[in-house]
């Protein structure tokens, strides 16, 4: 059987789709069904470290996507999953549930350096391969008014750590070390390596 010339993207994130397009990779969405509780997969377990957390969540997402592909009887092709989390020390900053939580997170990040961890996993048949990207982001001090204005924009909602690096918050980011695409949600260097290993020509 010839190798597939496309990948299933098991993500609803427009940013990840955009990044995958930068690689020139053909993809098909493998979105969760309406009855799938994807948010439950992102629950933190006890004193789980940020690295252990992001790897575990990515594996759970890949498990769910693999089962989804089987149920739908899809043609064989690599399945790509990814998860991103923001960590301040050992504290995991997930997606804020509301404006108050977004405000609290941004106060923590203001004037500090934090890590952004993105795990990527690809399944090709029974084989699974993984990679992890860790970057560091430094925020300049933000005033209460600046935080309030940013939260009011709605941009922090649905984003790990309550911000989108490619959005308005960029004016407060003083330094980045690592993978910009990884901070956005899909580290392209690691992703390209995984897809090549799965048989795609990039």
Curated annotation (Swiss-Prot):
Its main location: cytoplasm. It is found in: Cytoplasm. Signal peptide: none annotated. GO terms for cellular component: cytoplasm. Its cofactor is a divalent metal cation. Nucleoside triphosphate pyrophosphatase that hydrolyzes dTTP and UTP. May have a dual role in cell division arrest and in preventing the incorporation of modified nucleotides into cellular nucleic acids. This is dTTP/UTP pyrophosphatase. It comes from Polaromonas sp. (strain JS666 / ATCC BAA-500).
């Amino acid at each position: 059987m010839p190798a597939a010339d496309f990948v299933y993207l098991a993500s609803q994130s427009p940013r990840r789709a955009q990044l995958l397009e930068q690689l020139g990779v053909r993809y098909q969405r493998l979105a969760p069904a309406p009855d799938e509780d994807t948010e439950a997969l992102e629950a933190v377990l006890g004193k789980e470290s940020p690295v252990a957390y992001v790897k575990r969540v990515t594996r759970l997402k890949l498990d769910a996507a693999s089962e989804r592909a089987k149920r739908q009887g899809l043609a064989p092709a690599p399945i790509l999953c990814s998860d991103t989390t923001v960590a301040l020390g050992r504290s995991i900053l997930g997606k804020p549930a509301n404006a108050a939580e977004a405000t609290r997170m941004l106060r923590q990040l203001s004037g500090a350096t934090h890590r952004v961890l993105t795990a990527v996993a690809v399944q090709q048949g029974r084989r699974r391969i993984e990679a992890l990207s860790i970057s560091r982001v430094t925020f300049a001090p933000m005033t209460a008014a600046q935080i309030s204005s940013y939260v009011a924009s709605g941009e922090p909602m649905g984003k790990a750590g309550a911000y989108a690096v490619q959005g308005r918050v960029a004016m407060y980011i003083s330094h980045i070390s690592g993978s910009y695409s990884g901070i956005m949600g899909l580290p392209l260097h690691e992703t390209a390596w995984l897809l090549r290993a799965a048989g795609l020509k990039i």
